[in-house]
Amino acid sequence: MHILTDYASDIKGMISYFDRIIVKGYNRQLCNSKQFGYFLGAQKILYKDYPTYAQEKTEELCKHIENIAAEQNRPSMFLRSSKVSKEETALKLLNESPVDSGLVCLISTVELCTAMGLEKNHKNGQLYVGSQNRKCKFYYLYFIDEEFGWMHFKIQTWFPFMVQIYINGREYLSKMLDKEHIGYTRYDNTFTHIDDIKRAQELTVKIESEKLSRIFDAMARKINCHCELIRNILGHEYYWCLSECEYATDIMFTTRQSLEAIYPSLVEHAFFSFSCEDIMSFFGRKVSGKGSQSFQGDIASDLRKRHKGIRIKHRMKSNQVKMYDKVSVLRIETTINDPHDFKIWKDTITKDGYHKKAWTPMGKSIANMYRYAQVSLAINMRYLNHLSVIYDKVTPIKMIERMSSTIETDNRKYSGFNILKEETIRLFEILSNGSFIIKGFTNMDIRKRLYTHEDITSAKVRNRTTRLIRKLIAHELVWKTPKSMRYHITVKGRKVIGHILYFIKKEYPEAFAFIQ
């Protein structure tokens, strides 16, 4: 069974592409103490004069960047605290001073950095320039770019002038769709509808890392006025690497209700059923025999309720895959922070000096962006396929037949559930509430939601609810937590209730309207 085929009538389609992309740029020569010394020597700058020289270059850079904003008549703002959201500040400035494209605003603040500073060798008393952890001024330039849409360019104002570029993959994809004249509907950074999904997915296959490098180089030259000087002396500019990369697979449902009918079951299954071995298999780790015992690292699952829905995340070391719902979209998203856990087929040099192709640990170079996409998509699809194991349409029918009939447990008879009765449907909707997945529910939780027009503190209502819970336990829909007054829905209960609610919502929406 597979979600995409079993619920095809409720699904518009699926699209996979990058979500958040953070690219860092740095000059490797400027980060090396000896080569930095060569850089200064080529300009006849003595080590003792470096602080003055560095201050001059910083002032030149700051003046140049501020002139860019002034020439384009765009707003600038200095944030006294680096903890203030630059994104929200930029959006506020955009709202106050609208622009369709180009530079939106310039934001500056003081943050921690790694800069090149003057140091003294205590053994021989000689001066040299080495990397230091300190604070310096950073500039954030926000753009509405023709190629990438909403993005920002961050630059450090002290040597070695490291930069960071943030791109929203969904913004990037929307620009591709605009060029192809493909219609779409977006909510935030999520596509809820795309007119031509097949063509849209074709656009995402070709990843031109060389083109991206050229675009980033052009941006850097425009913003960093020292690029030409650095290139003339050292022969290199910025080296671009992927600091953080999110790749998301979005399954677009026709309605929010269609997604809600199955999502609680998906979350519960993922949280309670996925083992460490399962999570390792998502990330492409072969688990057999003593395979899991040789793994060095930590694996964890985390469930969190957000204002937009429920998010579940599985982490292996620093890489992670998560699932969450957003409007009518089910998103499975992989974040690669450490690519060395994955392999890439590339040219290598043997000990004998020969060149040959081999699978080697993947690095962070932007040239490997295509491989990031391949690995992330494979993880997303393994996760989706594993979720599909719970969807069996035959077994729930037999379960529903049994729960609709009278049963006898411990010499006591319990009547069946009338699945079309209003009170039963209300009860099932309450039980399917995602907030009960972790902590479970109590007698009072059911009373407050089920008997809204009655005195829930009365013994009559309390006893009636107790009998109802016992009935749920007898039908194996609920289990009681030992030594507590809390209850949890069983996997069987989640499966049966999910199918009943899905059927009623889909086939008899007017009959279901009373609990909306």
What are these regions (language model features)?
Residues 456-474:
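Short amphipathic alpha-helical interaction segments
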Residues 141-397:
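Extended, non-transmembrane interaction/recognition domains
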Residues 401-440:
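Short alpha-helical segments that sit at the start of domains
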Residues 437-452, 456:
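Short acidic, hydrophobic short linear motifs in intrinsically disordered regions
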Residues 485, 491-516:
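Short, amphipathic alpha-helical interaction segments positioned at domain boundaries
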Residues 451, 470, 474, 498:
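Residue-level detection of the helix-turn-helix DNA-binding "recognition helix"
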Residues 1-257:
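Long, contiguous, compositionally biased segments that the model treats as domain-scale units
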